[in-house]
């Protein structure tokens, strides 16, 4: 059963998807292009995400999903097109009729609005859980230590790890480390969260605890763009699913439409492969028991 959402889902599963929600736009991407050398990896992406919306991006490896997220945070500078987050430009500013790259100070301020979590946890191994979470609020936002600690404890409680604040990353499971990474991002009070395959490096038995934390964020109204291979999660939590292939958005729509009755053959072929792989993994797991 899909989550109850304040956003009204539209049933149109096409690349020209238009949401009927009246919520303000949080992320707007227009005609986004990105190349590595002569290889174009994003080919004119158009995407709008509204405040409080959960958008899941699926597609085969190499389709440009992770690059798209990195461009939204300008970890990967894009070649052309425009991105705005909460009405503010990402990466580039217009000056004297031209386009200039933001200064490092401007980029740091911009990135405070955009949380991003990767499949690698990237925690500082020599710092405790609490120290990992307070580092950016103190060093980047300039918060007082006491204020940063209060925020960190609130976010650790949010992901079910308040009791682990004095532990070191090496003392945590992979799922717990990933939840610390989520709490660390939330401590910066972002406008939008970008989550890039954050369960793919975890053992299967640890995936559920991370998905539960993401579900809680969705229920709390956090705007999220999620790259995932977890189709059940995409169905249950998303307001919209976007299918990408070969650097383009092939189609997008409500999860109960796109995941069960997609319009394009490329989408159908991808979903068939996912189902086949899931069945093989399930049979292998059963054989080991």
Model-derived regions: residue spans:
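Catalytic Walker B motif of ABC-type/P-loop ATPase nucleotide-binding domains
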Residues: 193-196
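ABC ATPase "signature
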Residues: 252-253
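Short coil-to-helix segment of the ABC ATPase nucleotide-binding domain corresponding to the Q-loop/switch region
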Residues: 127-135
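Conserved ABC ATPase signature
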Residues: 168-172, 176
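H-loop/switch region of ABC-family ATPase nucleotide-binding domains
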Residues: 228-229
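A short, proline-enriched helix->beta-strand linker immediately N-terminal to the Walker B motif
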Residues: 187-191
